[in-house]
Design a protein with these regions (language model features):
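Flavin (FAD/FMN)-binding glycine-rich loop and adjacent Rossmann-like elements that form
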Residues: 1-267
């Protein structure tokens, strides 16, 4: 878990030292205009965001839902075991932010608006990542390196967030955009230490920096499709995930994926 040092993989976007910080969790909320005045009394645990959230002026009556992706917390905690603590901290921010919008007097258009829905389960960005026979790193992403066992691809920017999240003084994210899409090799999609374990979604074999790109949903879905079809080959041939690669079954997998509509760059 956490970020690797710059020296480990020679990644220029990595921190100078291994600091163990992660991307945080987010909770969304939605609002609705009722067409008539609505009062809002914040719960006792609501946070005064004007004192605790450096970017509190970014809150407004018009934006809700995924536009508030930056309402994020937990990157400096254990994002596996501390989810409940992270959830409550985000609730404090959300109910405090709505109190600011409704009752500060700065947003008269919010008079007829109500807090329609608040999430209960934080959306995870990063927790554990597993090690496969190959680890995707920054250079694979920005140089679009070729892999003969490519079965998936990504195209999102390397999108890294400060561990302090909504409480940080830094920009809510740093995004580095590559000049094209990149391949994800099959060797990133199975464990190197557990014989019968596939990896997909947010836990594929990648560095923290490369994960900043591979973590998004569409890319995760592409990897999951590749894993599902590889698993079918394993069952049919009675072989392990690694043996799909070592027994020369990658071309077969690539053809099956292509026929199902899975795009693989440069294949």
């Amino acid at each position: 878990m956490g970020a690797e040092s710059r020296e480990e993989f020679g990644e220029k976007f990595a921190p100078a030292e291994d600091y163990g910080e992660l991307l945080g969790h987010s909770l969304y909320f939605y609002t609705k205009d009722t067409g008539q005045p609505v009062k809002y009394v914040a719960p006792s645990y609501a946070m005064d965001v004007t004192k605790t959230v450096p970017r509190f002026r970014s809150f407004n009556a018009k934006e809700h839902g995924c536009k508030l992706w930056w309402v994020e917390y937990g990157g400096d905690l254990d994002t596996v075991h501390d989810t409940e603590q992270i959830k409550w901290e985000l609730w404090k921010v959300i109910y405090g932010a709505w109190d600011y919008i409704k009752n500060s007097g700065k947003y008269p258009e919010a008079e007829t608006m109500t807090l329609e829905w608040v999430g209960c389960i934080p959306g995870k960005r990063e927790s554990r990542r597993f090690e496969g026979d190959y680890m995707l790193i920054q250079q694979d992403v920005i140089e679009q390196r070729y892999h003969e066992d490519a079965v998936s691809y990504g195209g999102w920017s390397i999108d890294l967030h400060p561990a302090a999240g909504v409480f940080g003084e830094e920009s809510a994210c740093n995004q580095w955009h590559s000049k094209g899409i990149y391949q994800i090799p099959y060797r990133c999609l199975y464990s190197r230490g557990i014989e019968n374990l596939f990896l997909a979604g947010r836990i594929i074999s990648s560095s923290h920096v490369a994960f900043g790109s591979t973590r998004v949903m569409a890319t995760s879905a592409h990897s999951a499709q590749a894993v599902a079809m590889a698993a079918a080959i394993c069952l049919k041939e009675n072989i392990s995930p690694r043996e799909v690669y070592s027994h020369g079954r990658i071309p077969e997998l690539q053809v099956k994926l292509s026929r199902m509509g899975q795009y693989i760059p440069d294949m």
